[in-house]
Swiss-Prot record:
It comes from Streptomyces arginensis. One of its GO terms (biological process) is amino acid metabolic process. Its cofactor is pyridoxal 5'-phosphate. The keyword RNA-binding does not apply. The gene is argM. This is 3-methylarginine biosynthesis aminotransferase ArgM.
């Protein structure tokens, strides 16, 4: 077991704190101004465990958030987790105990997701999003399968539309496979033709699990707070697993998350949309191939160089700039970099200029060679 390619680059950064590193690697949107939150309680919050399912304050805030999206569930259908990855692990361990043996993921998929599922002994298959979603390949799945699908998709930004989502949910009810919907970018759907809240179409939550978090949707990865939406009986079982695996999520973090949930995230969505326009214009001006994403907090750019790992190495060496490449995904390729669009505009512009300069030099070197 080893760190991901991005994790290795960030470890190199941590080992050289004297260097003026700049990080363009994380697709977490950054608040233009820190959100105005009330001071969170006293020492008492840290001197007691929260309920394993989550605090009443946060569960109610999440219920209201989902109601605004058209997702009609009660607090009994919600479980607070230590982020979306924690939720995925809870669900996957629960499902393997129920006999699930194969995981099918819409690809490319984060390397960490594939590794997590594979480490549980699952047979992990990763068809491309167009093959799986466009071809509606879920019709071949059954009770021994888990289908993991995120919309907006990381990294391509593709999203489910209403007709496809209805077909997916009908197939899940008919065929009995487990469906895990990763919704960690659901506040950032840009295409009017895309479905902003697929769970609003779920008629029966049995076998369906929604994942979400405050990391991307609220720009707060340090809180390590996420949530699962599921059938109430499954929430009871997952809450029991939460209790004996980690007891509960931090009470203080849940209080901050509840405030963020009530505050909303409009400054983040506006910044991400502006960043999308900037990156798309830059890519076209520099001859880089890119499909406008339907959603998400980044743009998946085909950099036009023979090897994006070499590009990333050069950016670190020459500009002290860290980027994420397609090696961070499975199956890996050598063509793409992931450009976050929710960062400070001047930093984004400066970083794109560095990427342009190094990419052009590498392209010229490849042509001469």
């Amino acid at each position: 077991m080893s760190l991901t390619p991005l994790g290795q680059r960030l470890a190199e950064v941590a080992a050289s704190p004297e260097e003026p590193w700049e990080i363009l690697a994380e697709n977490v949107p950054v608040w233009p101004e820190p959100p105005r939150l009330q001071a969170v309680g006293s020492w008492d919050l840290d001197a007691q465990y929260a309920p394993s399912q989550g605090t009443e304050e946060l569960l109610e805030a999440l219920r209201l958030r989902q109601r605004e999206q058209g997702i009609d569930v009660g607090a009994e259908s919600l479980l607070v987790t230590n982020g979306a990855f924690d939720g995925l692990g809870l669900i996957a361990r629960h499902l393997t105990g129920k006999g699930v043996r194969r995981a099918v993921c819409a690809g490319p998929v984060l390397l960490s997701v594939a590794d997590l599922l594979r480490d549980l002994g699952l047979d992990v298959q990763v068809p491309d999003w167009p093959e799986l979603v466009g071809g509606r390949s879920w019709s071949a799945l059954g009770p021994g399968d888990l289908l993991y699908l995120n919309s907006p998709h990381n990294p391509t930004g593709a999203c489910l539309d209403e007709a496809t989502a209805r077909d997916l949910f009908a197939a899940q009810r008919r065929l009995g496979f487990a469906l895990v919907l990763d919704l960690v970018y659901d506040a950032f759907v840009h295409d009017p033709a895309a479905l902003a809240a697929p769970p609003a179409l779920v008629e029966d939550w049995r076998g369906v699990y929604g994942l979400n978090s405050f990391s991307k949707n609220y720009g707060a990865p340090g809180l390590r707070v996420g949530w699962i939406t599921a059938d109430p009986q499954e929430v009871d079982r997952l809450t029991a697993r939460m209790e004996w695996e980690r007891i509960a999520v931090s009470t203080r973090a849940q209080s901050q998350a509840a405030q963020l949930c009530k505050l909303g995230n409009q400054p983040l969505t506006e910044r991400v949309r502006a960043g999308h326009r900037l990156v798309l214009d830059w890519a076209r001006a520099n001859g880089m191939r890119v499909s406008p994403p339907q959603g998400g907090t980044h743009v998946w750019v085909e950099a036009g160089v023979p090897d994006t790992e070499a590009l990333a190495d050069a950016l670190m060496a020459e500009h002290r700039l860290v980027v994420t490449t397609s090696a961070h995904y499975h199956p890996a390729s050598s063509r793409h970099i992931r450009v976050p669009t929710g960062v400070e505009p001047a930093f984004l512009t400066r970083s794109l200029e560095a990427v342009s300069a190094v990419s052009e030099r590498l392209r010229r070197s490849a042509t001469v060679g």
